[in-house]
């Protein structure tokens, strides 16, 4: 908001009447991105400490992402090279309001002379707030050694502070820090507020401070909504460490971590609270990342969170976005490669070896359909358009993935409302325009459903190849999973992207040991197992994943896994067609037999076809890989038995070592001599 007593600033006009910098309004209301549309309902905010950049860069990113306002963290104000009144004007110029000033530390329970000094400090903060146009200050519970305990003592302090603040048009919000010296629980903070009994004193709730201490969020439901002045939200991975260090370095956006933030927010909503929702995120990666991307992720997380709350607490007063539900996904309809005419011949030859049949040709484009059972691989050799641009950037690579969903139109609408970039690609007369959004590495994710003409894709857009015949191939049935590679710092972004748009969950992250360093891996999957995507985060280019990113200039899909019903029959059929499996060392099979107590005949069979093996309490897993190709993409064939739900993570270090040997041109020779 503008400073108190000053005329309201026009969003697109600066204080001196000049047109505001275009960056302040860039993206608003454009491009089908609903996150940039201002809402008159749900009020959203983010603390300036949550993202990187100087103050102006932060405001530009926050405004562009579609927030209503900000929390000004004192450090950002102190570092700003202008007066408090200039802060107010600058925030207003970006179409934002200052919803909170924080933090005011070490206040309650102090003996004299510290108590008087604390009130003097508060008066000076009130001066700043009046100048910048902010009417709510966050007071966090005292951690000072001099602080004295006692609810009544603290309540008396807040009653006096509320009286002083009220005369200045300011409200005081009390927050219990999880590591507070005497008050570290929102229930105690509420009791202080209740006993203070002042209209200008209320409670501030922070999901991290409650959930990190395993405090039942249902205890919030008994607090009157009008006495909750502000709500801060943060998630975090479950880590056993010091609360302060955990909070200051590992918070993340709601939905990116492991805390029950939805349960917390349901309890808040049940109180009748209808004020702002704000993100207060301390995260080392975020503070070194792109302000625009982090702000966008935050807004997406708030919209997705409130949609979850609305569906489980339908009678809440707090405004919530009205968006379609998360999409139910029935698997991968097709994977499209972009390539050149020359490299297409190599790719087509390899698919033929793997048992795929050239089944169709696009009616107007240079796109060939290769099929095996429910797997469709497209090879695009167009010399213009999106696919060609992707080829020029990444080389032969996956440019498109199409997913089968329950309702394509609703999926696109939900994605749009959550800030995904929707894309419309040209279609010829009578051809289908398949709805799409931009995904990892700039690739397309398209959506196809059974309730529209999209279900007739192969009939409408493709001409069958004469004599294509049987497409059963070597027994590859469907796409088991897609492995997407990215920089490690992007993993939270794409985790939230998938889990907020599609009805999927995230599997705990695992560390994959590569001779060149660690790769972090996390699977995104739905309950049926029909959609599985593994996200692999590379921290340097010495790992196989990092090498892929470097060589392909950021392409996403590094490998595709196909499911079969009989791993040995498929492996034998592939070997007969000239397929070269990635050879594993004899040491791997010796260790495998010792680990699982496998008999020699079974081990010999595995080694013959270079098949890797894993098992857990649920079932068994078989996998083998193609050797490296010039495109940097490789293929995996898997079989899951008896409910095995993993990805053979224990085998990953040995597979990567074998691939690096192959990459360097010195592969082991499989037992078959291939």
Where are these regions (language model features)?
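N-terminal pre-domain/capping segments
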Residues: 28-134, 296-326
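A structural motif
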Residues: 67, 129-134, 228, 273-274, ...
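Glyoxalase I/VOC metalloenzyme domain signal
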Residues: 55, 64, 293, 310-360, ...
């Amino acid at each position: 908001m503008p400073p108190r007593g000053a005329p309201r600033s026009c969003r697109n006009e600066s204080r001196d009447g000049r047109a505001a910098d275009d960056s302040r309004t860039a993206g608003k209301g454009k491009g089908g991105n609903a996150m940039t549309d201002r809402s008159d309902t749900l009020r959203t905010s983010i603390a300036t400490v949550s993202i990187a950049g100087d103050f102006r860069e932060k405001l530009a990113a926050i405004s562009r992402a579609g927030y209503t306002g900000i929390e000004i963290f004192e450090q950002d104000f102190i570092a700003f090279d202008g007066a408090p009144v200039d802060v107010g004007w600058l925030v207003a110029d970006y179409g934002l309001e200052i919803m909170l000033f924080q933090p005011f530390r070490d206040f309650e329970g102090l003996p004299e002379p510290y108590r008087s000094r604390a009130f003097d400090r508060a008066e000076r903060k009130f001066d700043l707030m009046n100048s910048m146009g902010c009417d709510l200050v966050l007071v966090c519970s005292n951690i000072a050694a001099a602080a004295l305990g006692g609810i009544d003592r603290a309540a008396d302090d807040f009653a006096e502070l509320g009286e002083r603040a009220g005369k200045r048009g300011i409200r005081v919000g009390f927050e219990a820090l999880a590591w507070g010296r005497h008050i570290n629980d929102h229930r105690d903070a509420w009791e202080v507020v209740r006993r203070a009994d002042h209209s200008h004193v209320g409670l501030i709730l922070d999901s991290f401070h409650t959930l990190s201490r395993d405090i039942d969020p249902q205890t919030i439901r008994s607090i009157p909504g009008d006495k909750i002045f502000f709500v801060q939200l943060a998630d975090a991975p479950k880590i056993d460490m010091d609360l302060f260090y955990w909070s200051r370095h590992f918070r993340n956006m709601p939905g990116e971590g492991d805390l029950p933030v939805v349960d917390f927010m349901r309890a808040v909503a049940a109180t009748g609270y209808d004020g702002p929702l704000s993100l207060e995120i301390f995260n080392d990666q975020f503070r070194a990342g792109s302000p625009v991307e982090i702000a966008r992720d935050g807004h997406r997380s708030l919209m997705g969170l409130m949609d979850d709350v609305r569906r489980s607490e339908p009678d809440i007063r707090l405004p919530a976005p009205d968006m379609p539900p998360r999409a139910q996904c029935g698997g991968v309809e097709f994977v499209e490669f972009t390539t050149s005419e020359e490299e297409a011949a190599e790719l087509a030859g390899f698919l033929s070896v793997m048992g795929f049949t050239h089944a169709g040709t696009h009616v107007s484009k240079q796109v060939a359909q290769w099929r095996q059972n429910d797997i469709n691989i497209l090879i695009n050799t167009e010399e213009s358009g999106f696919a060609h641009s992707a080829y020029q950037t990444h080389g032969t690579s996956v440019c498109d993935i199409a997913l089968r969903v329950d309702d394509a139109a609703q999926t696109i609408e939900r994605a749009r409302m959550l800030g995904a970039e929707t894309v419309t690609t040209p279609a010829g007369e009578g051809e289908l325009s398949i709805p799409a959004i931009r995904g990892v590495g700039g690739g397309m994710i398209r959506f196809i459903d059974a309730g529209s003409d999209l279900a007739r894709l192969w009939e409408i857009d493709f001409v069958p190849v004469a004599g294509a015949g049987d497409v059963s191939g070597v027994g590859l049935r469907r796409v088991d999973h897609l492995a997407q590679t990215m920089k490690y710092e992007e993993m939270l972004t794409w985790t939230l992207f998938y889990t907020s748009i599609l009805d999927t969950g995230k599997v705990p992250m695992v560390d994959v040991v590569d001779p060149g360093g660690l790769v972090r891996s996390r699977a995104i999957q739905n309950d049926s197992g029909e959609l599985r995507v593994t996200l692999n985060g590379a921290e340097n280019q010495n790992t196989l994943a990092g090498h892929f990113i470097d060589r392909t200039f950021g392409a996403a899909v590094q490998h595709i896994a196909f499911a079969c019903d009989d791993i040995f029959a498929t492996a034998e059929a592939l070997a007969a067609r000239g397929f070269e499996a990635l050879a594993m060392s004899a040491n791997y099979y010796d260790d495998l037999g010792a680990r699982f107590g496998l008999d020699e005949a079974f081990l010999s069979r595995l080694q013959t076809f270079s098949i890797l093996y894993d098992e857990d309490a649920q079932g068994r897993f078989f996998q083998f890989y193609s050797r490296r190709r010039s495109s940097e993409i490789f293929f995996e064939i898997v079989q899951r038995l008896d409910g095995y739900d993993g990805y053979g993570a224990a085998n990953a270090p040995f597979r990567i070592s074998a691939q690096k040997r192959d990459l360097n041109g010195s592969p082991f020779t499989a037992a078959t001599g291939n």
